[in-house]
Amino acid sequence: MQLAVVEFARNICQMKDAHTTEIVKHCKYPVIDTLPEQKTLIREKKYGGTMRLGEYPCLIKKGSRSHLAYLKSRQGKQNKKGDILVQERHRHRYELNNEFRKDLEDKGLIMSGINPERDLVEIIEIPRHPFFIATQFHPEFKSKPLKPHPLFREFIRAALANKKRIKSE
């Protein structure tokens, strides 16, 4: 998800100098960055408390492609608004910088999965694309050979549908 956000910021939002601070520490548009409370720890080289590790909640917005994937697989709990709450596994240090969230959304990037505890973006989508979903978490950590993660299953469905569409053209 992180480099997808960088590319979207550069090419769609016209933020030519957008980057992740993991690669370019002092870039003009740090669309991917560490959380403010992590910065001091990183400066002091105390990396132990700077990673987001383990399982965290993700609220998936009703009407999104991700929502449809989880709905089809009957995973998660639906709230009164129809959003689905799931638990997903993480292992990362950098996040989408919420200072740029509105700019990205205004240009069409959908933030379809949000951590409800910290308001962190977990899933992004580009609706005009046949299948463009990127995640901050690791869906492969909850996938098995005979029970693939809902997003993997939807990706395969979309690929097959696109293949049929191309053959018929």
What positions do the PLM features span?
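Catalytic nucleophile loop
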Residues: M1-A9
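Amide-donor transfer/coupling interface in amidating biosynthetic enzymes
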Residues: R10-E169
